[in-house]
């Protein structure tokens, strides 16, 4: 007889190989066809709401690995929240306005298109990009409302954004002023703080002499009767700002020295600089000298010095006063700072504090980076081309003390990678320290209080955002662009004042934009709204900062705190969001702008929690770079290994820091995936012939080890759900892997194989095991589903078509409409766990000893062994309680327990009996049945009799 055929060998249509890259697109298509997202919404209706608001990626270019990380993390959270019993929608969004798209239109069609044409082409381009990105996001297994995303360029969104502008204007936060702002010559526009990055750059560093003018006043400041001719010396890395100099700054508490030097410089024998900087400066200039007098910086306030180019051109024949500044340091330079208020924030603040009018500020640099033609000596030159010319002019005027090359970290545009300057222009601002009209706290105060009330994951994000808000300048709202939401103001042509009915007019404009998009503002004739007043006003041409676009989506998409705005998705979502989740750069981006708009509109943040993930680097910790050749595209991984591998990589990596990825790392992830898949295959194969409705064993009648397995599963489930709740995904993955490999594979399933395969197919022993396995399988699949979505869905379909087929709510469309599995409580759960924890420890000792005996060649498999265990009272009771089932737990042919006062002692010997050809146990009763001499007594009983007596394992 072929006894192999008498075994209950496992069988399942769930294949060993996932073939993920080939099969996943089919699941994506099926989810689309069967409207899985809509099914989730229907199943979740009426539950507590959980809102993750999607930070919109920019609608330009293909998605990269960072996008994949971001979307997968969001998908894990939304799916896990739905399965935890929440109603968690996912409405994806896209950021659609702004410079990068304008650049693409310029590249394709040239720079001089009419504004309306730029806008229509930009809108069409953004839609094309969204379609490309949407396809790639869906390929990652991300479920969401892909047919109805929010777009910042939707007419309704553009209109509501104008309404948001009206509300913060009405509250008193918005003002117009001349201030130095980050300016990109290539953009031709102001930049937000988040649009500035730093890179090393080499610039000329120069020491420049400003000649004395009123030598009598200077002598008195130093307590002298008189002084010779000379100059005060400054140090700067921006020679191009020298033509715009309007003041000098010294620190009030620093000691300054008059130094008589030789050989005598052009402007005279005396030089004025900080005492502490005299020695290194003279050495650098090749001079010798002695200090003739010192004075505190405060004594120099108000003294005036001649412009260093006064001798070179009449246009520079002016003097600059000394102002006091606490920001002056002695780290480098001379301890004297030159001030060009149009091109430096501290310079601007200092000069304004001393009464300099906006109209008197010198700003010869135009928006394209060139000096105005009227500027003496350098008119028409770009500031960078002018640098060497200015240095040469200073040298000819006798005002150049030293020029050196300096490599330093400098501001650059994040789009063009070109240098950015501070440039004073007339812009619209949201005031950080302005008190709103209702008398409440300033924007800075309410934002800082809001940070304190927000949960941060990881916790260090709080200090980072707090420091940014505490130190940031006013928010420059305006941009000089074409493809953006207009700051739809009417400005008086003579006074520059806003129309007195501006808030009302903004609503009228918003109504038109709602029907025709921002193009409606472009084509609007002011007479339509202003009537006869139209001649007095002009349309403001500025657009809103794109960070205002995305930063106000909590109002335009979620509906805001008061629901006054229409909002595109207010019915599905809610304000405030439970969570915003983005990369760590968004502390200065979307997190930041959303916080400010939320606090201006409603007095507190639009989110309860902020989750930050790090950037992706290669296996050596280097940034992804095409030039280095270490870029890993998510599309390529999906097409070769499968998106499931990307999902598992994201979930198993600590996202709070940098996420490392390489071919080698992905190879290890593939191995982890295979182990999980093999566990699932075993589980599915062993419940394939099981009917959950008609064949389940009551929980109270389960074998002891089966009850322990369920208690163990419940403990694991609680831990994993806790990790999901706290957004700790890599410990969740680790726990699931440990459960599959150690708790199941190396322990429970290893022991269970004998009972599953050798007992009668319909026996209580086998059905007890299958009852437990079905609960374990359901628990495991539902816990895995947020991460391994394709695999969990595939396995769920197999399970729904077999063991669960006869349940009342079958067939189930998808695993994603399920909630986490409800496992039975066991009154003796703690006692069971304590007992079996000790049994597992003893089993591990036995296995170690068995391996020693096997290595010595005394036995082949562990089933050839017979074990005697000598145990103290406590261990003896535990081991003896299993009776003959102990041998199945230890996977040996005989296990005998002996009482002993000492600690555990294990003796192992090879069995002297014959091997059963069916169960492979070596038993004394093999051959005793004349009809079946090849098998043992229990196999005879299982095949032809009442079945073996067995209750523990």
UniProtKB/Swiss-Prot annotation:
Chain sites annotated for binding Zn(2+): 916, 919, 936, 939
Residues annotated to bind L-isoleucyl-5'-AMP: 582
Renumbered ranges of motif 'HIGH' region: 57-67
Entry cofactors: Zn(2+)
Gene Ontology CC terms: cytosol
Cofactor annotation comment: Binds 1 zinc ion per subunit.
Catalytic activity: tRNA(Ile) + L-isoleucine + ATP = L-isoleucyl-tRNA(Ile) + AMP + diphosphate
UniProt keyword annotations, A-Z: Aminoacyl-tRNA synthetase, ATP-binding, Cytoplasm, Ligase, Metal-binding, Nucleotide-binding, Protein biosynthesis, Zinc
Gene3D superfamilies per the UniProt record, alphabetical: 1.10.730.20, HUPs, Valyl/Leucyl/Isoleucyl-tRNA synthetase, editing domain
Domain comment, as recorded: IleRS has two distinct active sites: one for aminoacylation and one for editing. The misactivated valine is translocated from the active site to the editing site, which sterically excludes the correctly activated isoleucine. The single editing site contains two valyl binding pockets, one specific for each substrate (Val-AMP or Val-tRNA(Ile)).
UniProt-recorded name of the protein: Isoleucine--tRNA ligase
Species this chain originates from: Bordetella parapertussis (strain 12822 / ATCC BAA-587 / NCTC 13253)
Encoding gene (name): ileS
